[in-house]
């Protein structure tokens, strides 16, 4: 399987070609090159998955871990070194399929969505870089290689979020995303260094005796790594960048939310899962609590947002919370429940990638039709965009957890694992699942039903998107319909052994009833007209509604801390010290040198008489000095 290195190198080659020679190409040619390369990458990924899983398990009954390519990149000292390579195991192969599929759909979709945009070639170059970075992250053979590509993912997202660099909001959003995730990544880097020092390796599978000897340092290292993952996955309170990241092109949002960018934290915990479960189970507990709180917070905020992309952004945050909860509850004393949590998390990552990409690309078609992100500019669009309407409905039903769509299977496995861990956790996550169904159908009815905005529609009649934009919708909708029937546990599990999925009928019945009730409530409130019931509720609970709309003022807290504390109390005194003390000292040296030069410039005047005076004065001074000393 040595050919797998091409899966990483082809997007890199596409980035270099489009980045260096793209401006000499026509936009259509640049798009064709980027899309063709991704099609080859996707085919190679599918063949890799087929070859890997069809080869079967080893004698121990697990899928083997393969490293078809590896090279020592940086020797550090002794046995410690950093390798670059390709690692194939069930979760990395699964992620290759996810990344290549979503990225290919985004590339095809962008041919229509970005047509006529300035910087079209640059856009496709950045997409190729982003794809290469995500692939490098998931096939990394060690934690340091993962960190290198982790940072490349951050750089790529910065470039794509700030693609419209003449737009102030996009520039600010790209800087915000970059800075917030850099703070979290500092914790990740410190954790990696602690881990490497005490474990004696950056490998994902170090020697057991080194970990035992390290004592409490390994849980500390893993906890710091989780901080980095929480930042990348937009967990509260490091979530503030993801909402503003919607300033980038909509296909970029699909790639960020559906592929590896925001699920990188989930993948990190899954990749290091044997270490978490063996040496830091308390960190996994905190992972579950942080995930549950984030899922609830984001679901409440999504219920009152009016921007279609921001509703989907908070939906992503909430769903990532579900994935982290599933990993966190895998510490259950019941081995079956523990394995179920891990498998359910990875299964939900897979299914979520497909229907969330479908939702964002569908949102792009809607924005393309009405030229607005606001739901107030929409309503009644099912008459004008039947294909987008149908595929968007499929995605909404999937994320709500309605049978037989993929979200039903993955979400119910998470809920089953939560109930096995703790009944309280199970009921909390069931309630959040109900909120998910409510806000998604609030969004659905606000876009496709309700009263039309005839004033806007008269000025610009909505229409269905071109074929390059609707084909990816149809493909992703088809995958969303059938993905739930994949025997996922046969391929991906916490220990590599086959895991047979058994639907808990009682949990499934409860979750379906909760989802159906939430959808019925959203239908009653939003389906027929412009939400008079919702307006009355918002007026009755105006304080809560305002707080949720303002995201419970967490952004304002950050604003206060940065401007009133960091800038006013720390940055301003440091700036004063730098300006008056450091610069003052340097200016004093310059003034002293200028003054000395002014005093002695006559020594080089060219006048022999002056030279004689200086000579006699110097001789007299030396004579007096000698007499004083003697």
Feature locations, PLM:
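Membrane-entry segments of alpha-helical transmembrane domains in multi-pass membrane proteins
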Residues: 1-9, 25-32, 80-98, 136-149, ...
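Transmembrane helix-loop-helix hairpins at membrane boundaries of multipass inner-membrane proteins
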Residues: 2-5, 21-125, 197-219, 271-273, ...
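N-terminal signal-anchor/start-transfer transmembrane helix
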Residues: 8-23, 104-105, 230, 234, ...
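Hydrophobic alpha-helical membrane-insertion segments
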Residues: 36-54, 184-193, 395-399, 472-487, ...
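Hydrophobic alpha-helical membrane-embedded segments
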Residues: 45-46, 356-358, 434-443, 515-535
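Aromatic-capped, Gly/Pro-kinked transmembrane alpha-helices
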Residues: 76-87, 489-506, 527-630
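Hydrophobic transmembrane alpha-helices and their helix-loop junctions in integral membrane proteins
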Residues: 105-146, 155-461, 468, 477-479, ...
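Hard-cation-handling environments
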Residues: 462-521
């Amino acid at each position: 399987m040595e050919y797998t290195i091409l899966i990483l190198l082809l997007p890199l080659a596409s980035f270099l070609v489009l980045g260096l020679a793209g401006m000499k190409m026509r936009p259509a040619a640049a798009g064709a090159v980027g899309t063709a390369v991704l099609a080859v990458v996707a085919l190679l990924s599918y063949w890799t998955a087929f070859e890997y899983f069809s080869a079967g398990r080893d004698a121990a009954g697990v899928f083997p871990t393969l490293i078809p390519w590896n090279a020592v990149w940086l020797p550090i000292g002794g046995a410690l070194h950093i390798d670059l390579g390709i690692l194939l195991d069930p979760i990395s192969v699964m992620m290759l399929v996810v990344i290549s599929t979503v990225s290919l759909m985004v590339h095809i979709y962008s041919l229509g969505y970005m047509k006529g945009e300035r910087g079209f070639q640059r856009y496709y170059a950045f997409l190729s870089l982003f794809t290469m970075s995500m692939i490098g992250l998931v096939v990394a053979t060690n934690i340091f290689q993962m960190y290198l590509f982790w940072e490349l993912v951050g750089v790529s997202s910065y470039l794509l979020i700030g693609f419209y660099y003449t737009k102030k909001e996009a520039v600010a959003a790209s800087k915000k995303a970059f800075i917030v995730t850099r703070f979290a990544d500092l914790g990740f880097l410190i954790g990696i260094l602690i881990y490497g020092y005490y474990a004696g390796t950056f490998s994902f599978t170090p020697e057991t005796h080194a970990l035992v000897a390290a004592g409490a340092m390994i849980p500390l290292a893993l906890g710091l790594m989780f901080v980095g993952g929480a930042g990348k996955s937009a967990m509260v309170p490091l979530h503030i960048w993801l909402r503003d990241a919607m300033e980038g092109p909509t296909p970029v949002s699909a790639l960020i939310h559906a592929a590896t960018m925001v699920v990188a934290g989930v993948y990190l915990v899954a990749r290091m899962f044997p270490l978490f479960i063996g040496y830091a189970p308390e960190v996994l507990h905190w992972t579950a609590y942080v995930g549950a709180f984030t899922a609830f917070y984001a679901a409440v905020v999504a219920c009152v947002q009016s921007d279609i992309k921001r509703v989907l952004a908070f939906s992503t945050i909430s769903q990532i919370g579900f994935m982290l909860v599933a990993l966190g509850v895998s510490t259950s004393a019941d081995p079956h429940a523990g394995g179920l949590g891990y498998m359910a998390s990875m299964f939900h990552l897979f299914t979520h990638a497909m229907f969330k990409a479908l939702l964002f690309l569908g949102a792009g078609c809607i924005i393309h039709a009405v030229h607005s992100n606001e739901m107030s500019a929409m309503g009644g669009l099912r008459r004008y965009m039947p294909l987008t309407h149908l595929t968007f409905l499929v995605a909404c039903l999937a994320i709500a957890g309605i049978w037989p769509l993929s979200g039903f299977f993955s979400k119910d496995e998470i809920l089953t694992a939560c109930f096995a861990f703790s009944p309280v956790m199970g009921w909390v996550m069931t309630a959040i699942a109900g909120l998910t169904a409510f806000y998604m159908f609030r969004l659905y009815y606000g876009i496709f039903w309700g009263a039309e905005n005839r004033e806007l529609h008269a000025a610009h009649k909505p229409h269905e998107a071109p074929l390059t934009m609707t084909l990816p919708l149809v493909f992703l909708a088809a995958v969303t319909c059938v993905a739930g029937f994949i025997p996922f546990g046969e391929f991906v599990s916490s220990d590599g052994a086959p895991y047979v999925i058994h639907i808990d009928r009682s949990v499934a019945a409860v979750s379906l009833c909760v989802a159906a009730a939430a959808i019925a409530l959203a239908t009653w409130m939003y389906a027929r007209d412009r939400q008079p019931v919702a307006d009355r509720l918002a007026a009755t609970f105006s304080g809560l509604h305002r707080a949720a709309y303002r995201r419970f003022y967490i952004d304002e807290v950050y604003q206060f801390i940065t401007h009133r504390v960091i800038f006013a109390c720390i940055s301003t005194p440091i700036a004063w010290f730098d300006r008056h003390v450091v610069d003052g000292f340097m200016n004093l040296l310059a003034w002293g040198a200028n003054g000395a030069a002014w005093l002695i410039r006559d020594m080089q005047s060219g006048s022999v008489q002056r030279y004689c005076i200086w000579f006699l004065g110097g001789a007299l001074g030396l004579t007096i000095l000698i007499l004083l000393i003697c």
